[in-house]
Amino acid sequence: MSISEACPAEVDVAIVGAGMAGTTLAMLLGKAGRKVALIDPHRVHHEEFRAEKIGMDQMLLFEKLGLDATLKRLVTSTTDTHVFRLGQFFAHEKKAEFTFSYGALINGLRDALPAQVPLTVGKVTEVSTGPDRQRLVLADGAVIDARLLVVATGHGEAVRRAVGVERIEQSKAHSLSMGFDLAISPRNFGHQSVTCYSRRAADRIAYISIFPLGDKMRANMFLYRNVAEAWTRAFRQEPQKMLCELMPEIAARCGNFEIASPVEVRQISLSTTQGHRRDGVIFIGDAFCTTCPTPGVGIGRVMTDVDQLHSVHIPRWLETPGMAADKINAFYDDPVKVAADEDGMRVSYYAKSITAGTGLEWRARRLRNNTARQLMIIGRKVRHLGQRRAPSMA
C-alpha cells in the first residue's frame, strides 16, 4: 500500500471509507485504469469486532472479481464442521469456510492496492455534490474533484450528514454479536470447527460458532438481547460459567469454555437510507443499509454492491458526460442489488423470529422443525446401532 501525501486533485471516482467495500472497489477500478482517490481517516485500520467468517458463496464473489488469491492469503480455511442441535450431535458438514480478523483483513487488502491507487489519509470536512462534479475538502485543506463520489463509510455518519442523507432505523437493537477467544488450541480442540444451536427459545440465542483463526480457537455467538441488559453484563463477567450452563453438550470439546480474551460485543440495528437518490453520489455496503450478521449474508451483500458498480454501472456512467440522478438511480434500481438487499433484510427478520419469536406461528414452526430434527437424530442413532450389530450377526 502506498500512502498519498498530496491526493490527486481530479479523479474519476472518489471513494470515502477504506473498509471492505471501499478498498475492494478502489482496487478493481484502479486495475481497470480508472483514476481513483481512496480516502480514510486512518492509515491502519484498527482492530474491530465485525465479520470474522465467510462461506464459499461469498468466496465465489471474490473469485468472480479476481480478488480470491489476495483474500486467501489473509484467511484461515476450514472444511469440516460438527453441528449440534437440541443438545445432541446433529450433523457432520463438509463445507468450505474462511475465517479472519476483520482489522487484519482490511489492512491486508489495503496492502494489495495497486500503486496507482494510493490511500489518502485524511478526514473529509466539506462535501459538495452536483450533476457534473463532486468536490471534497479534507481537514488539511486538500481538495478532491471527482465525477462520482462513493460513500463506503460503514456505520460512520459524518459524510452522510454532510451530503444530507438520513439513516432510518428499521429495527433498533435487533441483535447482539459476541466474540472471544477460547484457551484451548486448535490442535487440542478435537474438531476443526463446531456450530451449536441453543436448546431453548427462552435463552434468545441463535447459535455459537467456534472455529480456528490462525493459531487460536475463536468463538462468535449470535443472540437477540440488548447490550445494556443484566443478562449481557452477567455473561461478560462470567462467560465460562454461563456457557457451560447454556451448552453443556459441547463444553468438554471446548476445554470447558475456558476463555482467553475479553468478550467483545456488538449491538446491531437494521437500517436503511433515505434521500439517497441524488446527483453525483452513491452509498454502498453498510453505508446504504445494515442487516443482521446472524444469517451470514452481510459480506455477500456488500460485495454484490461492489460487483455491480464495478462491472456494470461505473463503466457505463463514465462513457458519457454528467453524473445526474438518473444515472445514479440505475444502481439503486439494479435488480441484482435490490434482490441482495431485500434478501438480507428478509433473513435478518426471519432468523430472529424463528429463534426467539413468541407468537403462535413461530412457536408452531419451532415445534415442527425440532420434531423433524429429533426424528433425524433418532434415525441416525438407529442406523448406527444396526451397523454395529451387523458384524456380530454375520
Model-derived regions, located:
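N-terminal Rossmann-fold NAD(P) dinucleotide-binding loop
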Residues: 22-23
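C-terminal helical "tail/cap" subdomain of flavin- and related membrane-associated enzymes
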Residues: 311-394
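Glycine-rich FAD pyrophosphate-binding loop
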Residues: 30-50
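Conserved FAD-binding catalytic core of PHBH/FMO-like flavoproteins
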Residues: 152-251
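Beta1/beta-strand and adjacent pyrophosphate-binding region of the FAD-binding site
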Residues: 5-19
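FAD/FMN-dependent oxidoreductases across multiple families
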Residues: 227-318
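Conserved N-terminal helical subregion
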Residues: 8-10, 60, 64, 71-165, ...
